[in-house]
Amino acid sequence: MNNLNGLSFHRLIVPFSKVSDMIDFQCDVFPDLDAATDEQLKQYSAVVYQREIDTNGKSLEIIKKYHSLGIKVIFDIDDIWTLPKSHYLSRLYEIHNIPAQTVEILKNVDLVITTTKHLASKIKKYNKNVEVIPNCLDHEDEQWKSNKTKSDKIRFGYIAGIFHKEDISILEMPIRKVLRHDINAQFVLGGYNDNADYNYYEKVMSGGTLTDKYQRVYSLPVHDYGKSYNETDVSLIPLQSNSFTECKSEIKLLEAGLHGNPAIVSDVLPYNILPKETAIFLNNSDINGWYKAIRNLSKDESMRKEYAESLQKYIEKHYNINKWTKVRKQILKSVLA
C-alpha cells in the first residue's frame, strides 16, 4: 500500500485492524508488497489486494507466484471495472487495459470480497467465490461521534471527494430556488480544496454568490473527515444513475446516519436498497421535490428528528462493524481452511 486514501482506509485498514484484534489473526500492512522477499511472504497465509494488483499486465504472474508459495490471494473490489467515458480515469483505464486485467484477476484469485449484492452479481460471472461485506464505519472512532457546532440556520451539507461534478449538478436548480425564498437554510460544502472542481461545487452550493447562506469546510485527513458533518444538520446525497454509479456503495448514508443527520438522497442504486422511511428519496430531475424537501426539513424539527432516528437505527443494526468483523473472520477462516 503506497498511500492512504478513503478507499484503503474503509476497505482495508479499519476492517483488517478489527480482524487483527482477534487473537487468532495477525494482519500486517506492506507499503510495497512487490519488494517483499519469498521468505518474508512465506510467513503469511494470504495476501489481500484492493481494486488492483498490477497495472502493467503482470497480475496473473504475481497471483501464480503467491500460489506457488502456498499463499491464498484475496481481492477486495468496491467499484465496477468498466468506466463511463465521463469518468476522470476512463482514459487511464483504456491505456492500461484495466477492465481486461481486472477480469483476469477475478478469474484467478481465491476469494473476492465486495460491497454490495448488485456488484457481486457482476463478479460472479468470473468467480463464484465472492462474498459481500458492506462498507461499515467504526462507531467508536471519534470522527463518527456527533458533536455539532451551533448555528441559527438549518445547515444542508454536501460532503464529498473530487470528481463528482455530474452528481452535484443535480442540486444546482433546487438550491437556487431555495435561495430565492425566505428559508432559514444554509448550504455547506465539505472537503473543499482550491481547485476547479471544488470551485464548481462551491458555485452550485452557494447559488453563485458567497453569502451567509453558504459555508465552506476545508478538506480533512481521511481519519478526520467525518468531523465535517459537525457543521451540518441535514445531508444532501445526489447521485447520477448509470452502470458505474449503481455499483457503488451506500457509504454516504452511513456517514449521515452516524452523525444523526436526516438525508435527502437520489432514488437510485445503491442508496434505494435502504427502506423508504430512512431518508427522503427523490428523482434527480425533480427540482421541485428537492426544493420542497429542503424547505420542509428546514422548518420542521420533528420531521428532521424522525428521519434521522430512522436512518441511525437502521445503520446501527445492519452496518455494525463489530458484527461484520465476525463475518469477515469466518469468511477468512473458510478460504484458509
Specify the residue positions occupied by each region the protein language model found.
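Membrane-proximal helix-turn-helix segments that form the acceptor-binding/catalytic region
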Residues: 64-68, 92-111
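Conserved acidic donor-binding segment of nucleotide-sugar-dependent glycosyltransferases
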Residues: 276-287, 296-302
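A short beta-strand/loop micro-motif in the catalytic core of glycosyltransferases
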Residues: 48, 74, 108-116
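A charged, aromatic-enriched C-terminal amphipathic alpha-helix characteristic of glycosyltransferases
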Residues: 285, 302-333
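N-terminal pre-catalytic "stem/leader" segment of glycosyltransferase-like enzymes
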Residues: 1-54
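Nucleotide-sugar-dependent
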Residues: 54, 166, 221-228, 233-255, ...
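Carbohydrate-associated surface elements
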Residues: 118, 136
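Conserved catalytic-core segment of nucleotide-activated headgroup transferases in glycan assembly
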Residues: 3-18, 138-144, 149-230
